[in-house]
């Protein structure tokens, strides 16, 4: 058994699904890991937009959104856990404090309270954010086991991929951080 100091912390990393990903929920996905510890991991899928946009979601929760550039931003499928709950991955806002925020190593924050959406609606919230419904979760040791079985590649996250890259390009862009493309990947693992 490894000592806690030997553990690799994958917080602020991308998980990139390998071609042999057994779970169709995660096939072709890039997951931003918000938290990884000996208790498990929590992440958000960043490349699966839904057919819901911000205007529709804000109407559902009785918030008025009149900022034209934001109306048609998609809400993302963040993962299969708590799919009715919103998770906002965003850059910190100087002087702002939200009711339920978690700072992520690397400078981003994840907020689950409605006050961040209220701030977005009034133009005082984060300028760069990604809103998901649901999240991905792993129990203690589960993610490490999936990585060992060649289910995921990992690489340090780049906020430009989260916020500035079109959703359909995020998978290839994340692979590009490793110097590879999807055409170079194989679902087979082996040892030399």
Curated annotation (Swiss-Prot):
It comes from the Bacteria. One of its GO terms (cellular component) is cytosol. InterPro entries: AlgH-like (IPR003774). PANTHER family: UNCHARACTERIZED PROTEIN YQGE, UPF0301 PROTEIN YQGE. Belongs to the UPF0301 (AlgH) family. This is UPF0301 protein Bcen2424_0864. It comes from Burkholderia cenocepacia (strain HI2424).
């Amino acid at each position: 058994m490894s000592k806690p100091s030997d553990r690799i912390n994958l917080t602020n990393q991308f998980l990139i699904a390998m071609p042999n990903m057994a779970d169709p929920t995660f096939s072709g996905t890039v997951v931003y890991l918000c938290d990884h510890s000996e208790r498990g991991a929590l992440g958000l899928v960043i490349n699966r937009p839904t057919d819901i946009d911000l205007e529709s979601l804000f109407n559902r929760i009785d918030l008025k959104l009149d900022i034209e550039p934001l109306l048609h931003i998609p809400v993302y499928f963040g993962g299969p856990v708590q799919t009715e709950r919103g998770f906002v991955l965003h850059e910190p806002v100087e002087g702002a404090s939200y009711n339920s925020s978690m700072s992520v190593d690397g400078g981003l924050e994840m907020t689950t309270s409605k006050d961040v959406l209220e701030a977005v609606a009034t133009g005082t919230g984060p300028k760069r954010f990604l809103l998901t419904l649901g999240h991905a979760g792993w129990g203690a040791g589960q993610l490490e086991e999936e990585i060992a079985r060649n289910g995921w590649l990992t690489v340090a996250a780049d906020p430009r991929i989260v916020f500035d890259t079109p959703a359909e390009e995020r998978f290839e862009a994340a692979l590009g951080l490793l110097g590879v493309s999807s055409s170079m990947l194989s679902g087979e693992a082996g040892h030399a």
